[in-house]
Amino acid sequence: MSRRSTAEKETAKSDPIYRNRFINMLVNRILKHGKKSLAYRILYRAMKKIQQKTGKNPLSVSRQAIRGVTPDVTVKARRVGGSTYQVPIEIRSTQGKALAIRWLLGASRKRPGRNMAFKLSYELMDAARENGNAIRKKEETHRMAEAXRAFAHFR
């Protein structure tokens, strides 16, 4: 039996301007090659663009986008008797948010456009309006989970 105690989960710190942990999570996913100041600049420019385009609070728009993209279930590959099944599993809210952020950034990187701030702002606005590639990814995941519901007992 192990004498070691379980490590406590570190809480995400909040960003300096919006004082929001979700924004900091987004910045950490935008981050490339340790250039955090560049990641902050990209995100804050995207927020400014959202403010100009919608006239709404950019924080509420991004929260709405995350809420729209967060999946309830996902599929996990399980190997049973020589064949692999896609088994649907429910996911926790923190894991769902992490997936949603990853999908939003992936969709915005694939978007055609000038710069990352521009692409991210439009992807967040689209996700808040319930369309865009990130929303499509969530719906596709839910469809896969629904199709593989027969294998749910393999959990």
Curated annotation (Swiss-Prot):
Gene Ontology BP annotations: translation
Compartments reported by the entry: Plastid, Chloroplast
Keywords: Chloroplast, Plastid, Ribonucleoprotein, Ribosomal protein, RNA-binding, rRNA-binding
A Gene Ontology cellular-component term: chloroplast
InterPro entries tied to this protein: Ribosomal_uS7 (IPR000235), Ribosomal_uS7_bac/org-type (IPR005717), Ribosomal_uS7_dom (IPR023798), Ribosomal_uS7_dom_sf (IPR036823)
Any Pfam family matching the protein: Ribosomal_S7
UniProt-recorded Gene Ontology molecular function terms: rRNA binding; structural constituent of ribosome
HAMAP family associated with the record: Ribosomal_uS7_B (MF_00480_B)
Similarity annotation: Belongs to the universal ribosomal protein uS7 family.
Subunit structure: Part of the 30S ribosomal subunit.
Its job: One of the primary rRNA binding proteins, it binds directly to 16S rRNA where it nucleates assembly of the head domain of the 30S subunit.
PANTHER family attached to this UniProt entry: RIBOSOMAL PROTEIN S7
Name of the protein this chain belongs to: Small ribosomal subunit protein uS7c
Gene name for this UniProt entry: rps7
